[in-house]
């Protein structure tokens, strides 16, 4: 596997990995995986964890009551288990002096642009200050999200959210096989997939674990999402010795899915998808130079005028003094807010608005230059 010197990695742990073949959370397996993630951080990599297991943790905490099929029962177990799961993770990562932060998401949070910006800013700030984010779906309030494969899909969306180079989905299955290895002894592991297509989906079948909600089919769906967004994805067995460290070191473990586009191309398409027409931010010559020649973010000081209306999180054009559109980007502030802070210093934003979403009106990572 090609390696960057330092990577941003999303690790997804399924319920089957957390239980390690038992009917409860398996602490030795969890502490070993925590050790590996801590080791990756020590090597300079950034790690985000997407974890299943809240429902199981709740079931364990309540003394393993008889399982019921009602959605509300699952949600109640998730509500009980989420705090317990985070408490366990907090204790395990404390062994390696790794601070953790809990984030509960649904895919709806990542479809709405304002909530997307908020989630992205929170997670990137956590990474910046050395905190390991632990993400789970908000099962206690979600309705149609508690279904097969949701955390697989969520992990791919999170990888895109934080611009991860690598997504690793750990399971009780070692990867994608030519046939179901539990029923066909001649099945062989496929170590590399160039593109997710109908043949790959056919190989996935409906294989899955009874303890979790995800099967191989949903992992292939996640692979399609991740690779289209420019992220390499690997499916591997969670009980494989030192699996995370070996993967990041470049060893071939499990099944690798190659990205079919660059992360930059994918993000540009996403940013441009909802550009607000007949609206723009006019900037001065100094801002033009900072944006086009120095790769800077757009700050209030360089803004001279606001045209049109938009909401926070929408894509707006940036126009030079000669009227030429030089870039587009996700705006951290609504049009009426930009109108109030234009020409101001970043340190004055909070005193002008009474709050602040950050120093940048449009961050360079959320900008497409022309």
Curated annotation (Swiss-Prot):
Domain of life: Bacteria
EC identifiers of the protein: 2.7.2.11
Subcellular location: Cytoplasm
Keyword Ribosomal protein annotated: no
A GO CC term assigned to this protein in UniProt: cytosol
PROSITE patterns on file: GLUTAMATE_5_KINASE, PUA
Metabolic or biological pathway, per its Swiss-Prot or TrEMBL entry: Amino-acid biosynthesis; L-proline biosynthesis; L-glutamate 5-semialdehyde from L-glutamate: step 1/2
GO terms for MF: ATP binding; glutamate 5-kinase activity; RNA binding
Keyword entries, A-Z: Amino-acid biosynthesis, ATP-binding, Cytoplasm, Kinase, Nucleotide-binding, Proline biosynthesis, Transferase
EC top class, as a word: transferase
Reactions this protein catalyses: L-glutamate + ATP = L-glutamyl 5-phosphate + ADP
BP terms from Gene Ontology: L-proline biosynthetic process
Gene3D superfamilies: Acetylglutamate kinase-like (3.40.1160.10), PUA domain (2.30.130.10)
Binding-site list for substrate: 52, 139, 151
Record: residues binding ATP: 12, 171-172, 213-219
Record-annotated PUA domain positions: 278-356
Family: Belongs to the glutamate 5-kinase family.
Task of the protein: Catalyzes the transfer of a phosphate group to glutamate to form L-glutamate 5-phosphate.
PANTHER family listed in its UniProt record: GLUTAMATE 5-KINASE, ISOPENTENYL PHOSPHATE KINASE
Protein name: Glutamate 5-kinase
Organism: Herpetosiphon aurantiacus (strain ATCC 23779 / DSM 785 / 114-95)
Upper taxonomic lineage: Bacteria, Bacillati, Chloroflexota, Chloroflexia, Herpetosiphonales
